[in-house]
Amino acid sequence: VQPDLVTMENVPQLLDHPVFEEFLANLEGYAIQWSVVQAVAIGIPQTRKRLVLLASKLGDSGLGLPTDTVKRKTVRDVIGRLRPIAAGEADPKDRLHAAPRLSATNLQRIQHSTPGGTWRDWPEELQAACHKKSSGATYPSVYGRMSWDAASPTITTQCFGYGNGRFGHPEQDRAISLREAAILQTFPPTYK
């Protein structure tokens, strides 16, 4: 198959893998452009980085790759006006704006977390045993709370769980809702 246009996006670490060079070699005859794109630089309120490739048999696509030309959006910019909800509560007008329940221990943990912070903010009695290991495998990015005035971390499929990353709401003592996660990924607020 020799399509006129080829697009690809992937993790930036692909650049360090031999398969990327093989992929480029298979695009002989194409005009190729590729770059690592910072999501926040193109209006997506996440710190996510992606390798983006455009290849064209029609010559230079003229599309160019995005550059830092837009106002950077923050968590506050995109979810700051949503109705406040508590852990285990849902917005009666929006079934996707629902926060999972937290255990009593995790509620205490998030109450001790600062915006932009992690489990390292907690008193020692709230720290999990795995965080106290001297092996270095302490998962510093789990149990984090987002910061209002920064981009969110990369939103993953596990973002609804407080212990799965830096997915604590910046101010409310809960994990982010599916609605908030969707908006942070640039889905419209009315998306069903």
Q: Which residues does each PLM region occupy?
A:
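C-terminal target-recognition/interaction regions appended to catalytic cores
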Residues: A98-K192
